[in-house]
């Protein structure tokens, strides 16, 4: 059974439905859903369980740090995927497990190299700023059994290490980061047209103010009902500052 952890943000209806759409798109395109288990990665649940103890509140979403709890939650066994909730899958996610993993790699991800983000806004309204390995951690296949994951990405480390150390994957060696083609983490409005396998609305999706007509937003909207569209409209008008 392959486990897929989708980051969950409870801050408003739009963020919550984004999680639902991500899950729906994975299930719709998966060749064998009996092989996968999708897990809602909730910060509140981790807090209630006494696992999440970070006190810094500088994350853009509730899953800014929870993603690094995945190896622990997976009992340091096998491979597990973490993905941001603002993804829309258009391929069989099982391919990632079958093609882009190996025993020598600690983690697999798309190694984005773009720098044209300055001046744009994050989904929470904060300014987008470039930094090394930006967006690499938005989709990760953890090799939960890898020695450096077991040794370095402990529960204590997930709770105490700096954002830089965590997101820049300083918990493993550079040669232990296996590259996935960018089509699996296609950054909307940053990349040219390609063989898109998973859309990532990194600046904002149709559930965000100002992004109602975002590129490829029509594909995302196909996954929701008319009633959900009305609720998103209400959320955009009432739940964002």
Region locations from a protein language model:
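Generic detection of long, well-ordered alpha-helical segments
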Residues: 12-16, 82, 90, 130
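GT-A fold catalytic core of metal-dependent nucleotide-sugar glycosyltransferases
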Residues: 66-117, 141
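A glycosyltransferase accessory/donor-loop signature
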Residues: 2-16, 20-21, 37-45, 139-241
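Conserved catalytic core of nucleotide-sugar-dependent glycosyltransferases
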Residues: 99-164
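Active-site-proximal specificity loops/subdomain of glycosyltransferases
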Residues: 35-73
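Short, acidic, metal-binding catalytic loop of nucleotide-sugar glycosyltransferases
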Residues: 25-33
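Hydrophobic beta-strand segments of well-ordered beta-sheets in folded domains
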Residues: 1-4, 105-107
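Short, surface-exposed amphipathic charged segments that create phosphate/polyanion-binding patches used
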Residues: 51-58, 121-127, 194-196
């Amino acid at each position: 059974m392959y486990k897929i952890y989708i980051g969950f943000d409870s801050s408003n209806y739009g963020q919550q439905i984004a999680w639902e759409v991500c899950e729906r798109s994975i299930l719709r395109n998966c060749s064998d859903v009996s092989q996968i288990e999708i897990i809602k990665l909730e910060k509140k649940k981790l807090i209630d369980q006494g696992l999440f103890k970070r006190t810094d509140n500088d994350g853009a979403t509730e899953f800014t740090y929870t993603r690094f709890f995945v190896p622990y939650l997976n009992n340091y066994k096998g491979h597990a995927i973490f993905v941001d909730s603002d993804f829309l899958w258009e391929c069989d996610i099982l391919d990632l497990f079958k093609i882009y993993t190996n025993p020598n790699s600690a983690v697999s991800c798309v190694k984005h190299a773009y720098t044209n983000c300055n001046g744009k806004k994050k989904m929470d309204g904060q300014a987008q700023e470039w930094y090394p390995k930006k967006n690499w951690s938005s989709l990760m296949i953890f090799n939960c059994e890898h020695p450096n994951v077991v040794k370095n990405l402990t529960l204590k480390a997930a709770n105490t290490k700096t954002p830089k150390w965590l997101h820049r994957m300083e918990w493993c060696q550079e040669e232990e980061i296996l590259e996935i083609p960018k089509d699996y983490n296609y950054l909307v409005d940053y990349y040219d047209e390609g063989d898109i396998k998973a859309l990532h609305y990194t600046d904002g999706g149709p559930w965000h103010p100002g992004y109602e007509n975002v590129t490829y937003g029509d594909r995302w909207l196909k996954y929701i009902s008319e009633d959900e569209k009305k609720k998103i409209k209400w959320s955009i008008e009432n739940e964002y500052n």
